[in-house]
Regions:
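Bacterial Sec-dependent N-terminal signal peptides
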Residues: 1-22
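Residue-level detector of functionally pivotal "anchor" positions at catalytic/ligand-binding pockets or at interdomain
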Residues: 516-539
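Consensus positions within tandem repeat domains that build extended binding/scaffold surfaces
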Residues: 113-116, 136-141, 159-162, 181-183, ...
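Short, T/G/N/S-enriched strand-turn elements that build extracellular solenoid repeat scaffolds
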Residues: 31-40, 56-66, 70, 171, ...
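C-terminal tail/sorting-segment detector
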Residues: 1-3, 552-566
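Structural signature of tandem-repeat unit edges
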Residues: 22-28, 45-53, 74-110, 121-134, ...
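Terminal processing/anchoring signals of secreted or surface-associated proteins
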Residues: 47, 503, 520-524, 540, ...
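Short, surface-exposed loop/turn motifs with a glycine/proline- and acidic-biased composition
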Residues: 537-559
Length: 566
């Protein structure tokens, strides 16, 4: 009996009672919680506190929930914490130290301050004080077991990363509270969210890495921030009429996103906004979009895309590695196609290049294996290295002379290319520009050509070269090199009348079988019985049928002749 009485007295002394494994403590004077918890701090699993709490008390609570003042894990087991009848007051010691930024955090009245339970990985359920008005930055970040939190009606603000890396499964924004940056970042169990109708912006990282499968965006939404939904489980997206901006990587790697409806009125889509959305099959970008960055790269299921009519530039990496893309429109006003814009679009058949196009970037159409036609307008002035490298489907190609320099690897590994005409105006063909065009048999070079670089036409099957330059272009013994010779064996070289002697003295060129062309530089005698095999316009473009003006006809015996159709 005496022992029982003594135990009752001791429990009264610490003002705590145990009911169904919950310990209840009243802290009349802030900063005295440790006196009442005593040696039980590592055994209590469920705790309710009434009274006043300051920074000193939260040092203990953090210790009980698994992390000490030096951010070292403890033996604490506190899983359930009810502070609904407690009050946070200013004062006491710093409850948390950010050693990276050398910053200490102290309590303020009615605030759950920055990092107040940061990394308390034992905490599973928490009820906040009824008077709480603010939840601070990273307040519960990395509370990796926290699945239930009760917020008071008077709460006015939740700040950035407050619940990041917790186990919260659902959340409704009420009482005017707005989403904050990184608020639920990497909350892998979060599946349901209700956003406030008055919300105008979803900040960066708000829902990245969550398990949300569907969400209704607010009718007043204006902006979706950087990585706002990246790596989440969304299956569809319907943008409200008010939306103006989708920021960088907003839906990056949403691997279940199969349907996207973009609104008229949308103005900008930033880089990688929908990259790696590998279930997305179609996309139509509204004409209201005026700012566009490379936002659909690695969408491997994407089959068709519609670009806005007012677009003047296709950005770098726009559809890079969209391996199933079959069709895309290039708007009439486009002047620039960026680097890697359509790289590795292995099913892209044909692209219509608009008049007015001026430049094509590096690797823009590299490894577009199924492209069959490359018809560039005379307005194109520059193309980047590797622009059409590996476009295996092209058989006949004519390039405009407006491209004064054909750069390195621009058309290399076009293994089925048989006939190539380079237009008047081109001066330089850089190294390896057409290397490994293994089926190339007929080549026409312009009178303006001055130099041919290292291995520019190496490893081909050339049987005929028609070079219209009076002065032999500079080249070296690799420019036309084959597997076992400097030039293709038994290859005919047609040169302008009067230029044969110069070519016979020129290194490399003298290895060809040299013949002078007719006066036109195009016509030659046609053998009896020879038939037409191909027809070209004066600009070098292949013709499907006779056209008015000068036609260049390729004959079955390897000769060419010029006719004028009136």
């Amino acid at each position: 009996m005496k022992r029982a009485l003594l135990l009752t007295v001791c429990m009264a002394a610490i003002a705590a009672i145990s009911q169904a494994q919950q310990t209840t403590v009243n802290v009349e004077t802030a900063g005295t919680l440790s006196e009442q918890i005593g040696s039980d701090k590592y055994t209590i699993t469920s705790l309710k506190i009434t009274g006043n709490l300051n920074g000193t008390d939260f040092i203990l609570l953090r210790d009980m929930a698994g992390i000490d003042l030096d951010n070292v894990p403890t033996e604490g087991k506190l899983a359930t914490l009810d502070l609904s009848e407690a009050k946070v007051v200013a004062g006491g010691e710093a409850y948390y130290t950010d050693y990276v930024n050398n910053k200490e955090f102290y309590t303020n009245d009615n605030e759950m301050g920055n990092c107040i339970f940061y990394s308390c990985d034992k905490l599973e359920s928490l009820s906040l004080p009824a008077g709480t008005t603010v939840v601070g930055d990273s307040a519960f970040m990395r509370c990796t077991a926290l699945s239930e939190i009760t917020l008071p009606d008077g709460l006015k603000e939740i700040r950035s990363y407050a619940f990041s890396e917790t186990q919260i499964a659902s959340f409704s924004f009420v009482n005017g509270i707005m989403p904050a940056k990184g608020m639920f970042r990497n909350c892998g169990k979060l599946t349901s969210v209700t956003l406030p109708e008055e919300c105008e912006e979803i900040p960066a990282n708000t829902f990245s890495g969550t398990a949300i499968t569907e969400i209704t965006l607010p009718k007043n939404l204006v902006k979706i921030g950087k990585e706002a939904f990246s790596s989440c489980m969304l299956t569809s997206l319907e943008c409200p009429a008010t939306l103006e901006e989708i920021d960088e990587s907003a839906f990056f790697m949403c691997s279940s996103l199969a349907s996207v409806s973009l609104n008229d009125g949308l103005q900008s889509i930033e880089g990688s906004a929908f990259s790696y959305c590998d279930k997305l099959e179609t996309i139509e970008i509204p004409n209201s979009v005026t700012e566009l960055e490379g936002c659909f790269s690695n969408c491997t299921a994407l089959k068709s895309a519609v670009l806005p009519e007012g677009l003047t530039a296709i950005p770098d990496y726009m559809f890079d590695r969209c391996s199933n893309l079959e069709s895309v429109n290039i708007p009439e006003g486009v002047k620039t196609i960026g680097d890697n814009a359509f790289q590795n679009n292995m099913r892209l058949l044909d692209v219509v290049f608009p008049e007015g196009l001026e430049s094509i970037g590096e690797n823009a159409f590299s490894s577009c294996y199924t492209m069959e036609n490359i018809n560039l307008p005379e307005t194109v002035k520059t193309i980047g290295e590797g622009a059409f490298d590996g476009c295996e489907g092209v058989v006949v190609m004519s390039l405009p002379g407006s491209i004064t320099t054909i750069p390195r690897n621009a058309f290399s590994y076009m293994v089925y290319l048989e006939e190539l005409t380079i237009g008047e105006g081109t001066k330089t063909i850089d190294q390896m520009a057409f290397i490994n065009c293994e089926s190339l048999t007929k080549l026409t070079l312009p009178s303006t050509l001055e130099s041919i670089g290292y291995a520019a036409f190496a490893y081909n099957m050339l049987t005929e070269v028609d070079c219209k330059a009076v002065t032999p272009p500079a080249c070296d013994n690799t420019s036309f090199a084959g597997w076992d010779s400097d030039v293709p064996q038994d290859c005919l070289l047609y040169v302008p009348q009067g230029a044969k002697a110069e070519y016979e003295k020129a290194d490399v060129w003298k290895e060809f079988i040299i013949k002078e062309s007719e006066t036109s530089g195009i016509e030659s005698e046609t053998a009896a019985g020879a038939t037409e095999t191909a027809r070209y316009g004066i600009d070098g473009r292949k013709l499907a049928k006779p056209a008015r003006g000068i036609n260049i006809i390729r004959m079955s015996d390897g000769t060419a002749r010029k006719v004028i159709n009136r």
